[in-house]
């Protein structure tokens, strides 16, 4: 593989190529539409012959996430991927990883629900991802790409954040980004870490018999309530550190805007076109795109919203991120929602029409 390579490929394929180039140690997954190209591309790349990366098709999503627990617990850079109903099956394992402070990467290429739903794209997993879909008080770092390039770029970023904070991280994509094809600049190759580097960089990891160190026990269990409370408070302190340091977002034409669209992922691409159409009609509109859905850029959005006439939250769901937007602005300006469901991607003209009807 070239150090840097420009290719035309699907978002799912970009995830696979970026995983190999990011020095990932192992991928454990199970095919499900619309993300099956991730494991298919990894099988075609055969990285076990070049970098030594393990690629394993597990028997289920439940098995996949528990393999992630084991791999991450040994200090390895490991990942899995699935789509909405498959990620729902992983929630217990994600909670266990958060409780045991085990790093790992989960890629969710969303499809419509609830239940089996449809194979068409959706953003209906926002609550599940940002609120912690398993039991207990925990959070997952959530990055929302809106291009094939970001699909590739976020693999290494998410994994680095996972290890920096010893916490699961998620790339929350959708079927549009996963299946669309764009030009992408693949990142340079990063070698996998040696066993010595793993032991040095991850002193907490369970690495077997390690000279000069007591064995590490990886667990989320603590039966003494007073110690479990201490553990939970330590987790919350870590989450506050993440909130203070890892917020990411993007703005477009917001300085002179009277109204602002708030959207993430593929919906933000459509909203960007809606900004163009609205401005052609003389309506000054901008776009605020959260890149980290957790931590949500609440302070940055609240600051931007000052002096605006209203915010229109555009999503491919019944209204989920809109709750975080309303919490951020605390009733200081009107907030409306426009969403399509069932796998339908909104049209830019619909968004402009919704702005006129709901906020003007």
Indicate where each model-derived feature is located.
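Thiamine diphosphate
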Residues: 37-131, 141-163
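N-terminal glycine-rich anion-binding loops that anchor highly charged ligand groups
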Residues: 7-44
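Conformationally flexible catalytic loops at phosphate/diphosphate-handling active centers
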Residues: 166-251
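Glycine-/acidic-rich phosphate or pyrophosphate-binding loops and their flanking alpha/beta elements
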Residues: 8-14, 236-259, 272
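Structural signature of the thiamine diphosphate
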Residues: 140-197, 350-360
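Peripheral docking tails and interdomain loops at the edges
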Residues: 315-360
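Redox- and metal-dependent alpha/beta enzyme cores, enriched for Fe-S-associated oxidoreductases
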Residues: 248-284, 288, 294-300
